[in-house]
Every structure is written in C-alpha cells, then in structure tokens.
C-alpha cells in the first residue's frame, strides 16, 4: 500500500506541473496579442460552449438535495512535508502534493468516486483598486479568488483526466479585501518576496492546515456546482466546479503583495508586476447551476404578481359561477 501511495504521489507531482503551465499564452495585462481573445487559436477548447469562469446568477440556480457536505482528508493538520511556492509567470501556485500519507483530498458533496487528490492551489487578482476574482455571485466579485485544484484519482494520467468531464474538481473561494490582515495567509504572503522573477520556486518555511484558508465548517455547506473548464489554456471542459457562497477575508496589504509579484513582459522589456490575471467570464449557455440545500437561491419571479393574478382569476370565477 505504501508503494502504491508513493507511486500515486509521484505521478501527481508530475501531473501538477502540467496544469496551467503553458508558456505560449498570456493575459491582456501582459500582452493583448496573446490574451484571452486569442486563446482559442492556441487551444480550440477555449472557444467551446462549456467554458469557465461564469457568473452565478442566483435566479437561475436549482436546488439539489444530493449535494451533501464535503468530506475533507488531510485538511485539518499541517503536514511535515515541505510545500513549494512558485511564480510561473501567470500566477502564484502552492504545490501541496508531495505527501506520503494522509494526502489532502476531497470526496462526497455529489462528486464521483473514489476521491479527488489536491494538486495545487493558486490565486487570481486584479490591478490596484480593482476586483480580480474570476467567478462572481450575482455579479459581485471579490478582490481575489483562490482555486484548490484536485484530480480524480481514478485517472492515471493527465491526458485521461483532461479528456473526461469529471477529471478535476476545483474549489473556488472569493477573497474579500479588508483593512486587517488575515493571518491564515501569512505563510504564503511572506514567501511572495522571494519570488523575484517568473520561474522561481521556493520552499515555504512552514506549513499549515489547509482548512484555515476555507470558509468555516458550517459555511462550507453553502456552495454552488456546475460543469465547466480549466480557466487557462488548454481550457479543457473537464472540471466539476464548486463555488462557495461565503467569502474569506484577506488584508489590503496582503493583496498589494500579490500585485507586486513579477511577470514576464514583452521581449526587450524588464519584468513588471503581474496584475489582472483573470479570464473574462464565459456564457453559461444551457448549463445547470446547482445549489446545495443550505445555499441561497433567489426566485426570478415575484410572488406578488402571481398572487394578484390568482385573486383576479378567483373573482372572475365567482362572477361566472353566480351568473350575470
């Protein structure tokens, strides 16, 4: 069993290095010539009908009572194995998949069996003074967005996972800026200063319980689910997205530190701060957005007009019954 776990961990390390790692694309803030409008030229799936991110319109969501609570493994304790923080030129990634036992994973919550193993988490943010989340709830964005990327353990290769609609499960958390720092992000933010240029990776000086980055236990019951894609090329439609209703705070000074991370600029120019590393929202099309039993939904039709019509109909019916 130990040998099998070791082999799986090794494979996941290799697979994680391939997720969101292409260097042939960019964001508009880096160079509009290779920005999101051109991604479908590099990866045809980026122009497909089931792309991410999207706006979660609470008038369109449908309650789904099969969306039970998540079962988290390895999220409540700080692992002994070191974590790697990396600047890949497009975002900051925290690779957390070099574990030997009790590896972070999720199951339940309507996800297919057996489980989804955590590969990495990364962040999206805006330019100074602007919102930077990829998803939104009723058009409300966050200053940043955190993605926890998990891969279905029944697939043995990245190619297999990328080609299946249940290949990945990504947890999306909107981060809302506040004046006071959130100490749960301190270990990550303190490592940002060491990411002096794209391609640099450093070991974090300390690990922590991943659960500390998520909403509280009760708030984890409130989430939305839809089928979508990776939000960077190749944009494969292989993701079961979970967008939590409740946000997590992050300090203004901490957001500024992310906005100071260096990116790769156009040839001949010095690296400059990476900002606005988010993909524009994509059409929902005919997809369903499901709400967990505890999540908020909002009716698109007021009950008052319906009540008025019912009363009018009742009056007409009584007059017809009574005769002229």
Swiss-Prot record:
Region entry Disordered, spans: 269-290
Catalytic activity: hydrogencarbonate + H(+) = CO2 + H2O
Cofactor: Zn(2+)
EC number: 4.2.1.1
Primary location group: secreted
Keyword terms of this UniProt record: Glycoprotein, Lyase, Metal-binding, Secreted, Signal, Zinc
A GO cellular component annotation in the UniProt record: extracellular region
Ligand binding (substrate): 231-232
Record has Metal-binding as a keyword: yes
Active site: 90, 155
Glycosylation sites: 184, 194, 203
Keyword Metal-binding assigned: yes
Record entry for activity regulation: Repressed by coumarins.
SUPFAM superfamilies in the cross-refs: Carbonic anhydrase (SSF51069)
Function, in words: Reversible hydration of carbon dioxide.
Stated name of the protein: Carbonic anhydrase 15
Taxonomic source organism: Mus musculus (Mouse)
């Amino acid at each position: 069993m130990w040998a099998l776990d070791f082999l799986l961990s090794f494979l996941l390390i290799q697979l994680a290095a391939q997720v969101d790692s292409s260097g042939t694309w960019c964001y508009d803030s880096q160079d509009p010539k290779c920005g999101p409008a051109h991604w479908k030229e590099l990866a045809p799936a980026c122009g497909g009908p089931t792309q991410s991110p999207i706006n979660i319109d609470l008038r369109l969501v449908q309650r789904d009572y099969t969306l039970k609570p998540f079962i988290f493994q390895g999220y409540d304790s700080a692992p002994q194995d070191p974590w790697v923080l990396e600047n890949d030129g497009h975002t900051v990634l925290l690779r957390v998949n070099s574990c030997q036992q009790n590896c972070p994973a999720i199951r339940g919550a309507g996800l297919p069996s057996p489980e989804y193993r955590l590969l990495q988490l990364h962040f999206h943010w805006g330019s100074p003074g602007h919102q930077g989340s990829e998803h939104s709830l009723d058009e409300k964005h966050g200053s940043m967005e955190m993605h926890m990327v998990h891969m279905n353990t029944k697939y043995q290769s990245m190619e297999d996972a990328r080609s299946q609609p249940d290949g990945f499960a990504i947890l999306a958390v909107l981060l809302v800026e506040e004046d006071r720092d959130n100490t749960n992000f301190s270990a990550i933010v303190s490592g940002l200063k060491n990411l002096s240029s794209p391609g640099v990776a450093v070991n974090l000086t300390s690990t922590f319980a991943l659960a500390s980055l998520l909403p509280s236990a009760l708030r984890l019951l409130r989430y939305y689910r839809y089928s979508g894609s990776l939000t960077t090329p190749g944009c494969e439609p292989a993701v079961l997205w979970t967008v939590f209703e409740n946000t997590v705070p992050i300090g203004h000074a901490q957001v500024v530190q992310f906005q100071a991370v260096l990116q790769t600029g156009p040839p001949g120019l010095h690296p400059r701060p990476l900002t606005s590393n988010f993909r524009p929202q994509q059409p929902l099309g005919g997809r369903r957005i499901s709400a967990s039993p505890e999540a908020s939904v909002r009716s698109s039709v007021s009950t008052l007009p319906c009540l008025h019509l019912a009363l009018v109909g009742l009056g007409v019916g009584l007059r017809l019954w009574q005769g002229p």
